[in-house]
């Protein structure tokens, strides 16, 4: 069963507290250092994928090949080598005249569950003089399974869960969930029509973007009519329309493995303030 999840977000404004810090800068002149490009990164494991690359950088290019070892650190890792992943090689070589190389990792797709978040730590084995203390010789690789995308997986009967319905059920809703029907838009690519989404008689559309397996985003066209004010609030506050669009604060996303969509939305109506919801 497909699922669409929307959760009521607090109406109050959230304040972010910023703390000051001192930054310590280190300069160098033609010094050679080798390091992972990121200390933590997430990678998609795809069904038809050969290897994904964990980048390693050097501060300078040399006129000779440089080879370094790659060690797997068990502490802090929950992925198992040989079960969840395998390295192409336990060494990397930065070619003469170049400043980068990759540790190539094969994610073992069939052994990773859709809900798994598996990580392991890699360490560069290299001479001390090329290890820059400002950065680290280690990186954590996090793997997420990304199933093949098919827009039809998000069509058909669908259970909608929304905390908005707990606060504003209107005259028809009696729980946080609704059973609705979804279908592929007849002309717009990757667009889904949600029939009677939160209130009967009001359809909305969403668009799925499968371009980045790590960030499978969902967008909505602006100013779609979610419901009429009288049915939801019991009174007409203005033009009797409640509009819905993307939340400017949070990204909406979908999951091809578990066939669900999580929508962060913003409601607009004649009221002292709009409400952010998910």
What kind of feature is each model-predicted range?
Residues 189-197, 258-268:
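Short, hydrophobic/proline-enriched secondary-structure or compact coil segments at domain edges
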Residues 22-161:
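Acidic/polar, low-complexity intrinsically disordered N-terminal segments immediately downstream
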Residues 17-20:
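C-terminal motif of bacterial Sec signal peptides marking the signal peptidase cleavage site
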Residues 269-278:
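Single conserved hydrophobic/aromatic residue that forms the stacking wall/gate
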Residues 9-14:
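Hydrophobic helical h-region of N-terminal Sec-dependent signal peptides
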